[in-house]
């Protein structure tokens, strides 16, 4: 079929085509008495969106025709449109009697329900202007609508069935009938209309435009239509009919609130929410509809404030831009809509002042304050409990919760508060600690990675690669130029979860920078931080570790006493031991023999290394600054590292004490690892305790021995050491195993083997003996409840299953036994000292009695309690 031209002769052929299709009436658009202007292509344009008078009828849109693709908006023949739609596009009178229609009365106007059900309204479409043979989209209007199907309704334009002709002779006679039977109003004329194309109200419903005059938006012929998407669900909307194009039609005050003029504007190519009025039947549907956060962006340029927007007196929440701000209907997180002070008009007394600090990251837990006017606040009946909303997962921190509770309730804002999910984030640290069956590890400086986040879990699947050659060349250049600070800084930037440094580079950092005697404090700290980062991202194992026991011995012996990075290196060594032990324990529980700790600290393989650690520990304890060493060691002010000096022996004793305390803690951690690396912790602890016994007897002062026992991390090892000391101090050794009965036996049969500071204060010797018995009872409780006698491989299952410890031989003591032994010990002390007990010693004896009671789960009556205390 040849395309028709725009001339009048071709349009006269239109009745012939209608007759071929079996239809008799036609519309003759050539009988227009009013002069028409031509556009650039020489075609006559008839703009049906403009009203010439009250006698002109309002043409309606028949949406029942088959849609066409958006590509057919261009000036083509009407025959092309007719071929796609299956019937004539323009016709004078259509007999609708043969078509069954479902009607209902809305606002005293009949409306076809098939129009409401078959079309989903998304946003503002361009209106249409009909030329001789073409359909042109024109500029959008304040009451225009966009239909689903990519603007395919443009080919479905049809005059109303009650309008037989648009000629001047029939205008007056047909005006009343056409106005009463119209399906949908055409866009209202643009008079003093200020509407951005992106922020339009509900389709097919006239709303008051802002009282602000501005030029009309550009024509749709020059601006391509926006690509909008909408959900598959159909949102129903009422279609009030108009008898004539309104100049200013107010919204009817119903229970259905109309959206204000500051509705959300959606940018192009961004899927958004359907910009339509929410009716009561739709609100119930939206309450159960999940929404993904972050899908409704809002910018200040897309919002046109209008304080004159009508508000609903109640019954439904206020809907700014079709986003429901109500904790009962549709709460949403701060990541959904980003408000700025310019987006929302300020109402005094109703809204808090918003600043830039109110824009929060969506990952942060926070409260949501939805701004709404008092007239639009939800009724108590419409509020829904927040826990019923399945998609809301806003976490609330305790600090934020206190703030929200302390703030008074404002009438214009609704605070969205959520409950912390049970068994959620707060249980993760507990579960994480279960992975470490000993005490918590020596913490990284990057301690937040103890609980791996989402990025860390995702990075585990990526392939590891060495640092690229070009970047590595920059590092080697700084090494050749002897610029250690540049080397460290380059590596700090280049090391990442995907890229690891070569082994020789790590060895250079340890030996040439960290253990260098000429580097500054800042360079040493940077080198240590770099090693910690490498250890965090790429933990060393038995094959990749870059230190050995020979290097550690050199640093801890006399030769390394003057190295300023001595303590930092020891911390790095302990960190590598701890990380590798825990990694092996979590991933390959049966392969602890392949860990670094098993290679260097096993009592079966390397007992001399364990003896070295004990020797370094006792040396650090005896030189902890409480007594000045004879060689007068002191520390540098910046690093806390020992330096040899023959003058000023009493300078900076606190720094010396702190340095040695750090060394003591690190060495005690190494011993606790040595207890666990072998299959039987009991055998390992017995061997280490035998090695340690002679060194403990050589500790000269009580304060140093107290430091030695209180810093010991392994409770099993402390029990074994104290047991050996008490066994050697008894005149008649006992065959009882480590138990409560054995502790009672030590109470009345042991004497102190440890050196006393002065012979004049003999009661202090007994005071220390009672203190050691307290240490023994306390550690014994840890051994029983934490299953420390079992292998670390089996300990996890015992803890998770909450298996109670097995009763030990000698733990079945009674209240009478405890009372009898305590009274005998008091009598013995008075006899040995020749004087009444001092208050300090009395308190410790009473505390020992309570520990025995609670250790045996005994509940003594009040009489023996008072009797025992009075006897003291």
From Swiss-Prot:
List every stretch annotated Interaction with CTBP1: 1-367
- Name the coiled-coil region(s): none
Q: Where is the composition biased (Low complexity)?
A: 163-181, 292-313, 369-384
SUMO interaction motif 1 (SIM) (motif): residue ranges: 26-30
Q: Which InterPro entries match?
A: ElonginBC-PRC2_ViralRestrict
| Subunit structure of this chain's protein | Forms a heterodimer with SLF2. Interacts with SMC6 and ZNF451.
Instruction: Please give the PANTHER family that the UniProt record associates with this protein.
Output: FLJ44216 PROTEIN-RELATED, SUMO-INTERACTING MOTIF-CONTAINING PROTEIN 1
Question: Which protein are we looking at?
Answer: SUMO-interacting motif-containing protein 1
Q: Which organism is it from?
A: Homo sapiens (Human)
């Amino acid at each position: 079929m040849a395309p028709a031209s725009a001339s009048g002769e071709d349009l006269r052929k239109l009745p012939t085509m209608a007759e071929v299709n079996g239809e008799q009436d036609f519309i003759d658009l050539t009988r227009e008495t009013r002069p028409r202007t031509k556009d650039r292509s020489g075609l006559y344009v008839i703009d049906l969106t403009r009203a010439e008078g009250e006698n002109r009828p309002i043409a309606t849109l028949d949406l029942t025709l088959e849609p066409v693709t958006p590509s057919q908006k261009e000036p083509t023949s009407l025959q092309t449109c007719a071929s796609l739609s299956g019937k004539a596009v323009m016709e004078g009178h259509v007999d609708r009697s043969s078509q069954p229609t479902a009607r209902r009365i809305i606002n005293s106007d009949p409306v076809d329900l098939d129009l409401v059900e078959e079309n989903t309204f998304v946003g503002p479409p361009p209106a249409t202007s009909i030329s001789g043979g073409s359909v042109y989209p024109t500029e959008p209007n304040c009451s225009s609508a966009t239909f689903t199907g990519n603007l395919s309704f443009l080919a479905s334009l049809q005059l109303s069935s009650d309008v037989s002709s648009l000629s001047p002779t029939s205008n007056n006679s047909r005006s009343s009938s056409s106005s009463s039977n119209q399906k949908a109003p055409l866009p209202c004329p643009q008079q003093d209309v200020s509407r951005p194309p992106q922020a339009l109200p509900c389709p097919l419903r006239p709303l008051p435009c802002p009282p602000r005059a501005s030029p009309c938006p550009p024509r749709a012929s020059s601006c391509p239509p926006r690509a909008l998407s909408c959900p598959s669900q159909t949102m129903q909307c009422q279609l009030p009919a108009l008898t004539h194009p309104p100049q200013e039609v107010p919204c009817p005050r119903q229970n259905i609130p109309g959206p204000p003029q500051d509705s959300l504007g959606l940018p192009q190519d961004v899927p958004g929410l359907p910009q339509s009025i929410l009716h009561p039947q739709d609100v119930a549907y939206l309450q159960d509809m999940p929404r993904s956060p972050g899908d409704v962006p809002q910018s200040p340029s897309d919002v046109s404030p209008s304080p004159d927007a009508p508000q609903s007196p109640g019954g439904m929440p206020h809907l700014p831009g079709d986003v429901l701000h109500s904790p009962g209907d549709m709460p949403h997180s701060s990541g959904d809509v980003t408000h700025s002070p310019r987006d929302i008009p300020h109402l005094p007394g109703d809204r808090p002042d918003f600043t830039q600090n109110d824009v929060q990251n969506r990952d942060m837990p926070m409260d949501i304050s939805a701004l709404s006017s008092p007239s639009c606040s939800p009724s108590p009946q419409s509020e829904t409990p927040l826990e019923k909303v399945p998609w809301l997962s806003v976490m609330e921190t305790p600090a934020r919760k206190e703030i929200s509770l302390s703030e008074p309730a404002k009438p214009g804002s609704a605070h969205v508060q959520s409950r912390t999910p049970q068994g959620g984030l707060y249980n993760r640290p507990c579960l994480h600690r279960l992975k470490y069956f000993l005490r918590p590890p020596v913490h990284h400086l990057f301690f937040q990675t103890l609980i791996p986040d989402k990025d860390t879990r995702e990075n585990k699947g990526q392939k590891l690669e060495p640092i690229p050659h070009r970047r590595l060349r920059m590092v080697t250049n700084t090494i050749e130029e002897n610029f250690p600070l540049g080397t460290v800084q380059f590596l700090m930037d280049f090391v990442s979860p995907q890229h690891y440094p070569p082994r020789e580079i790590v060895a250079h950092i340890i030996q040439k920078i960290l253990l260098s005697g000429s580097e500054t404090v800042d360079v040493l700290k940077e080198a240590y931080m770099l090693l910690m980062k490498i250890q965090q991202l790429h933990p060393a194992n038995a094959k990749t570790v870059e230190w050995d026991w020979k290097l550690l011995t050199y640093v801890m012996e006399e030769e390394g006493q003057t190295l300023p990075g001595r303590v930092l290196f020891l911390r790095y060594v302990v960190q590598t031991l701890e990380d590798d032990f825990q990694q092996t324990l979590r991933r390959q529980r049966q392969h602890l023999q392949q860990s670094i700790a098993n290679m260097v600290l096993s009592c079966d393989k390397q007992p001399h290394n364990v003896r070295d650690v004990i020797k370094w520990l006792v040396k650090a304890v005896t030189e902890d600054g409480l007594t000045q060493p004879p060689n007068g060691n002191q520390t540098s002010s910046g690093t806390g590292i020992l330096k040899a000096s023959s003058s000023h022996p009493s300078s900076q004793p606190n720094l010396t004490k702190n340095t040695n305390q750090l060394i003591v803690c690190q060495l005690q951690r190494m011993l606790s690892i040595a207890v666990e690396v072998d299959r039987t912790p009991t055998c390992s602890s017995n061997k280490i305790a035998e090695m340690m016994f002679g060194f403990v007897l050589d500790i000269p002062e009580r304060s140093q021995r107290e430091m030695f026992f209180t810093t010991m991390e392994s409770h099993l090892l402390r029990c074994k050491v104290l047991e050996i000391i008490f066994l050697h101090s008894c005149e008649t050794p006992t065959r009882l195993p480590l138990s409560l009965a054995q502790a009672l036996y030590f109470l009345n049969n042991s004497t102190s083997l440890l050196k006393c500071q002065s012979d004049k204060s003999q009661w202090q010797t007994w005071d220390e003996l009672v203190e050691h018995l307290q240490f023994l009872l306390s550690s014994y409780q840890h051994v029983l409840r934490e299953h420390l006698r079992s292998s670390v491989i089996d300990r996890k299952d015992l803890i998770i299953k909450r298996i109670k410890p097995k009763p030990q031989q000698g733990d079945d003591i009674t209240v009478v036994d405890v009372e009898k032994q305590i009274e005998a010990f008091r009598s013995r002390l008075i006899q040995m000292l020749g004087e009444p007990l001092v208050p300090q010693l009395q308190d410790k004896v009473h505390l020992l009695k309570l520990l025995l009671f609670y250790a045996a789960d005994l509940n003594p009556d009040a009489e023996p309690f008072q009797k025992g205390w009075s006897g003291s």
